[in-house]
Amino acid sequence: MIKRPRWQYVLLIALALLALATLLVPCMVRTESELRIRAGQQGLSLPDGFYVYQRLDQRGIRIKSITPEGDGLVIRLDSPEQQLLAREALQNILPPGYIIALSESPVPTHWVREFARAPLNLG
């Protein structure tokens, strides 16, 4: 049997860990496409979420959720392409004075959600 130097084993393990990290990091750091709508002028009220949902659905844009957040609406979409189509459609649908911003938020992975939901048992 051939005896190899230790540095070769260390290098092999380091390369394997690097390859594993390269494969796992994109799975852990996913983002979700969002649109944020808020009134840019005084006196404008937020559009109704159901109205926005219907108008985007008529144009074939798939929506994950619409939620009020702070002083605006947050629309979560399936993909960045859907995000751009929705922004363009909303600029045509809504009257002037609304600010429609593109954003992305991190999506927690399944194990992170389970860990955050698990109760802390002490003693």
UniProtKB/Swiss-Prot annotation:
Function: Modulates the activity of the EnvZ/OmpR two-component regulatory system, probably by directly modulating EnvZ enzymatic activity and increasing stability of phosphorylated OmpR.
Name of the protein in its database record: Modulator protein MzrA
Subunit structure: Interacts with EnvZ.
Location of the protein in the cell: Cell inner membrane
GO CC list: plasma membrane
Transmembrane segments: 9-29
A molecular function GO annotation: protein kinase binding
Gene responsible for this protein: mzrA
The entry's keywords: Cell inner membrane, Cell membrane, Membrane, Transmembrane, Transmembrane helix
Topology of this chain in the membrane: Single-pass membrane protein
Cytoplasmic side: 1-8
Residue intervals on the Periplasmic side: 30-123
Pfam families recorded: SecD-TM1
InterPro entries in alphabetical order: Modulator_MzrA, SecD-TM
Family, per entry: Belongs to the MzrA family.
